[in-house]
Design a protein with these regions (language model features):
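Phosphate-binding loop/pocket of nucleotide- and phosphate-handling active sites
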Residues: 29, 73-102
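Active-site/ligand-binding loops adjacent to catalytic centers
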Residues: 1-63, 78, 99-102
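Short, active-site-adjacent cap segments at secondary-structure transitions
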Residues: 12-13, 68, 93-94
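Short glycine/serine/threonine-rich phosphate/pyrophosphate-binding segments
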Residues: 64-72
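A short, small-residue-rich loop immediately preceding and capping a beta-strand
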Residues: 60, 67, 85
């Protein structure tokens, strides 16, 4: 069985485009909610910290990718068998103008 798990922040981190889908803000037209089997909320502060750890390891991504990694880790702890696939679709340089890299 394949399951689609949507990772979202538990609260809005202050970066436009990263608002949780459950808050009813702008939902992308390409999002087909019928294919999502589960929504998994990730703590925004933890995601922020994980993205900093990834940057120190040479993977320079944004906060959403920190959330994806945390989500994959959470799912891995729940699974007895299977595979988890995630995509890091963000780059850290988009957030130079924020406090993310201070």
């Amino acid at each position: 069985d394949i399951q689609v798990v949507c990772i979202e922040f538990d609260e809005w981190p202050g970066v436009e485009g990263l608002k949780p889908l459950s808050e009813g803000h702008i939902i992308p037209e390409i999002l087909d909610k019928t294919v999502i089997d589960r929504m998994l909320e990730i703590d925004v502060i933890e995601a922020y910290e994980v993205s900093k750890v990834l940057a120190r390891q040479g993977i320079f991504v944004g906060q959403s990718c920190g959330a994806y990694l945390l989500g994959a880790k959470t799912l891995a702890e729940e699974l007895k068998t299977g595979h988890i696939v995630t995509v890091f679709n963000d780059i850290g340089e988009r957030y130079f103008s924020t406090s993310m890299w201070d």
